[in-house]
A protein has these predicted regions:
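Small beta-barrel nucleic-acid-binding modules, primarily SNase/OB-fold domains
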Residues: 1-132
Length: 132
C-alpha cells in the first residue's frame, strides 16, 4: 500500500485498541489521557457486517448475495481481531487534509508496534480491498 506522498501527515503514538468494530474500523484510546476515538482505516474497504446502504451497493457492484458479503465481513472482523485484539498498542498516521470522515471517524493508516501496517495486511490477506 502506498501512502499519498503529496499529503501532509501527522503521527499519533501511544494508542491502545479498545474495540475492533469491523474489518476496517477500531476504537482506540490514548494511553496518556484516556481519550477514546474511532478510526476508519484509510485506503481500504472491508465487507459490511449488517444490512445497510453500503451493503446494497456492494451487492449490486459485485453481483454477490448480501448474506455472502456479510459472511466475508465476519471473516474480516475475525481476522483483524486475531492480529490486533483489544489492548494491542498501535500508532496511526493521518493525512492532515483528510483527517475526519462524514461520521466523525479519524481516517488513518494503523501501525502495530513492529511497524507493520494493518491497512496493508488486510488487503494483502484478502480481507479488504483498496479504496480511494
Amino acid at each position: 500500500m502506498q501512502l499519498n506522498a503529496k499529503a501532509n501527515k501527522k503521527k499519533k503514538n501511544h494508542l491502545k485498541i479498545i474495540k475492533v468494530v469491523d474489518g476496517d474500523g477500531l476504537i482506540v484510546e490514548n494511553i496518556f489521557n484516556n481519550q477514546e476515538f474511532e478510526i476508519r482505516f484509510l485506503g481500504i474497504d472491508a465487507p459490511e457486517l449488517k444490512p445497510c446502504r453500503k451493503l446494497i451497493q456492494d451487492e449490486r457492484e459485485t453481483h454477490l448475495a448480501a448474506q455472502f458479503l456479510m459472511e466475508l465481513g465476519r471473516k474480516s472482523l475475525k481476522y483483524l481481531l486475531e492480529i490486533a485484539p483489544p489492548n494491542t498498542n498501535v500508532s496511526i498516521l493521518v493525512e492532515t487534509e483528510n483527517e475526519i470522515d462524514l461520521y466523525g471517524r479519524t481516517l488513518a493508516y494503523v501501525f502495530l508496534e513492529d511497524g507493520s501496517c494493518l491497512n496493508e495486511i488486510m488487503i494483502q490477506e484478502g480481507f479488504a480491498k483498496p479504496y480511494s
